[in-house]
Amino acid sequence: MATIQIIDSIRLNRIGLQTKDANGKWVNIHKQQGDLDGACSIYSLIMAMLCQRMIEEQDIQRYKFPDRRTPKGKFLYHFFYEQGFVQNGYNYTALAREINKQPFEIRAIHKRPRTNDDRIELIEQFVDQNIPVIISTEFNGGAHALLAIGIERDEEDIITKIFCLDPGAPSPKVSSWNCFIDVSKEGKSQYPFYYVTEINTYKVTLDDMLIIEHKNFD
């Protein structure tokens, strides 16, 4: 029998998929990007920060201008205002560097596993610790960022699906995810896995990953 594991910081109820923000308030976690921008990695970053209680919902409301006197305000201002319109996506190396040079007390760890088995194992490792993973998928013609929040294992304890929040798809209403990647079989093509949402299905491969953590000052 298959088993599903979702990070424990999120819950699904009649309002939607929610997490507690930095203020301890239950807020909707999924953020959907615009049709014209390529800032899927920034949306995934914001969702990761929300479900790890690094920011509050009010911090990211439209027309809410960040207070640049604080480290958090400087961080949000940099990504929301100084970076401008992101059309062609964000390189994870550059994104990690931008995060880590900010004064806000979080850090980004850029992971580049060499094989798909290593990538799946890394996602499992962090989901087991209830830490979401920003993952990059590549497809024929482009790349897309998602937030991995859960996994499915079969009766032999083999991972068969990676459950994600996709900023490019509608918010989930009846499950804790709005996208999954079927990794039960690895095809022989350049794009060996199926990516599935309610509006799209196409073949992808897994690529770089980002882990967002609180800085440890011990």
Label every PLM stretch briefly.
Residues 1-34:
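Flexible propeptides and autoinhibitory/regulatory segments associated with cysteine proteases
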Residues 10-14, 23, 66-69, 119-122:
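Membrane-targeting and insertion segments and their boundary/processing signals
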Residues 112-164:
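Active-site-adjacent substructure of cysteine-protease-like catalytic cores
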Residues 151-218:
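Noncatalytic regulatory segments and standalone regulatory/sensor domains
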Residues 7-20, 71-77, 179-187:
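Charged, glycine/proline-rich intrinsically disordered loops and linkers
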Residues 92-107, 146-152, 177-182:
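Hydrophobic transmembrane alpha-helix bundles
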